[in-house]
């Protein structure tokens, strides 16, 4: 009985450590295990000009965590790049995003589906790579001309962990 109480109290404490992380410049919020993320900004040249690629990352320090990392990326396309009525262009962009993410890690796409964040189109997908030992779960959204990419990476044996879904599902743009 004592071990059951200890287990339940441990689970409760673990659940309580998740905190809200907000980026006012990035106009998003997400839950992370500690409420902390570090930001890096990289300039990238595209066919539409230079963009600032923002990466927010949390990497657990514990041994054998549910997820190896939690990431939110965003960047802004020039104003008007994706008119709201350009459904085909937005769908093509989302498909290309998924394909490029698979190609970037020489992985295998195991799942993908269309999703929405309020009225904004998005995608969810999973990629296995590194001899199918590692899994990346991703969501992306296009909010106006801002692109968000939310990802977690884990070992395959941890692929069903609740932390990945908690992180991905908590994302909100504001």
Residue ranges and their predicted role:
Residues 76, 129, 153-154:
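Short beta-strand segments enriched in hydrophobic/aromatic residues
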Residues 11-19:
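Bacterial Sec-dependent signal peptides at the C-terminal "C-region" and cleavage site
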Residues 20-22, 29-60, 94-141:
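Signature of long, low-cysteine stretches enriched in small and polar/charged residues
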Residues 63-67, 120, 140-148:
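Short, solvent-exposed coil/turn segments at beta-strand boundaries
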Residues 3-12:
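Sec-dependent N-terminal signal peptides
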Residues 41-43, 50-51, 81-84, 159-164:
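A short, polar/proline- and glycine-enriched secondary-structure boundary/capping micro-motif
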Residues 24, 34-37, 90-105, 144-174:
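Surface-exposed amphipathic alpha-helical segments
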Residues 55-92, 149-150:
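A short acidic-to-branched-hydrophobic micro-motif
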């Amino acid at each position: 009985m004592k071990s059951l109480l200890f287990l339940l109290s441990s689970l409760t404490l673990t659940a309580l450590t998740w905190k809200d992380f907000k980026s006012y410049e990035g106009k998003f919020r997400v839950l992370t295990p500690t409420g902390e993320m570090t930001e890096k900004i990289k300039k990238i040249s595209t066919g539409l000009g230079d963009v600032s690629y923002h990466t927010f990352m949390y990497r657990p320090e514990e041994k054998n965590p549910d997820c190896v990392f939690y990431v939110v990326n965003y960047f802004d396309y020039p104003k008007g790049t994706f008119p709201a009525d350009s459904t085909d262009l937005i769908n093509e962009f989302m498909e290309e995003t998924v394909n490029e993410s698979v190609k970037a890690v020489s992985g295998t796409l195991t799942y993908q589906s269309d999703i929405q964040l309020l009225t904004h189109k998005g995608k969810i997908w999973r990629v296995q790579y590194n001899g199918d030992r590692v899994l990346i779960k991703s969501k992306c959204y296009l909010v106006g001309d801002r692109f968000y990419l939310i990802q977690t990476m884990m070992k395959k044996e941890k692929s069903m962990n609740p932390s990945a879904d908690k992180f991905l599902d908590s994302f909100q743009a504001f």
